[in-house]
C-alpha cells in the first residue's frame, strides 16, 4: 500500500505494484483521473491488472440526518481545519516543492474557497449520514472508480467517544454487510 496523490507518488506506487491509497479529501470526480492514471501505469510496468485502490476516509453515521450533517460539519470540519493550518495551505510553498503538485492543487482550491469551502469539498467526498445515504454514496463511488477497498475511521477531529461508537456500531450492522456482498 502506498499513499498516491501526486504524479510522482502515483508513479512510485505503480512501479512498486502497490495498492494506491487515496484520502477522501475532495470530490471523487477530481480523484478519478489520477486513480485511472495509476492503474494505466501499473499495467504498463507490470503487464497485469492493478490491485484495488484503497480509499481512506472519516465517517459519521447515525439515524437523524440533520444532526448527522451538523456532526459531520463539526468533526470532519475540525479535521480539515487542522490540516489546513498544519500544511499552511494559504501559502504558495507547494508550487516549488517537487512531488507536491496535488497539494498545490488543494492549496489553490483552499485559498480560493477558504476553510468553509474546503470543508464542503471534504464533505462531498467523505461518508456521513444514515446507513442508506452512506451506501448510496459508496455505490456512486464504485460506479465512478470501480471496485475499491475501504479504510474508514470513526474517531477524528474531536469526535466524542459516544458519537464514534454509535457510528461504528451502526456502520458495522447496516453498511458493512452490504459492502462485503460486493
Where are these regions (language model features)?
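Hydrophobic faces of well-ordered beta-strands that scaffold small-molecule active sites
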Residues: 1-3, 18-23, 51-58, 148-154
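Long, low-complexity C-terminal extensions of enzymes
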Residues: 130-171
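A short, mixed-charge helix-start or loop-turn motif at secondary-structure junctions
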Residues: 20, 120-123, 157
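Active-site-proximal loop/turn and secondary-structure-junction residues that shape catalytic pockets
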Residues: 26, 59-61, 156-158
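An alpha-helical appendage that flanks or caps ligand/catalytic pockets
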Residues: 29-147, 180-182
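A conserved active-site cap/scaffold subdomain adjacent to cofactor or substrate pockets
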Residues: 5-35
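Flexible, glycine- and charge-enriched loops at secondary-structure boundaries
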Residues: 24, 28, 127, 161-165
Amino acid at each position: 500500500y502506498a499513499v498516491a496523490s501526486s504524479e510522482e507518488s502515483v508513479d512510485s506506487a505503480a512501479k512498486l505494484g502497490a495498492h494506491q491509497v487515496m484520502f477522501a479529501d475532495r470530490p471523487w470526480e477530481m480523484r478519478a483521473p489520477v486513480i485511472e492514471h495509476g492503474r494505466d501505469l501499473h499495467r504498463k510496468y507490470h503487464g497485469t491488472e492493478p490491485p484495488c485502490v484503497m480509499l481512506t476516509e472519516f465517517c459519521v453515521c447515525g439515524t437523524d440526518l440533520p444532526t448527522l450533517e451538523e456532526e459531520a460539519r463539526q468533526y470532519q470540519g475540525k479535521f480539515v481545519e487542522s490540516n489546513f493550518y498544519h500544511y499552511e495551505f494559504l501559502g504558495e510553498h507547494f508550487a516549488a516543492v517537487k512531488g507536491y503538485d496535488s497539494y498545490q492543487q488543494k492549496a489553490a482550491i483552499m485559498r480560493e474557497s477558504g476553510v468553509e469551502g474546503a470543508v464542503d469539498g471534504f464533505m462531498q467526498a467523505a461518508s456521513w449520514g444514515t446507513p442508506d445515504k452512506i451506501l448510496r454514496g459508496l455505490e456512486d463511488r464504485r460506479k465512478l472508480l470501480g471496485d475499491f477497498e475501504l479504510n474508514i475511521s470513526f474517531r477524528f477531529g474531536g469526535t466524542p467517544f459516544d458519537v464514534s461508537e454509535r457510528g461504528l456500531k451502526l456502520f458495522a450492522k447496516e453498511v458493512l454487510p452490504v459492502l462485503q456482498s460486493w
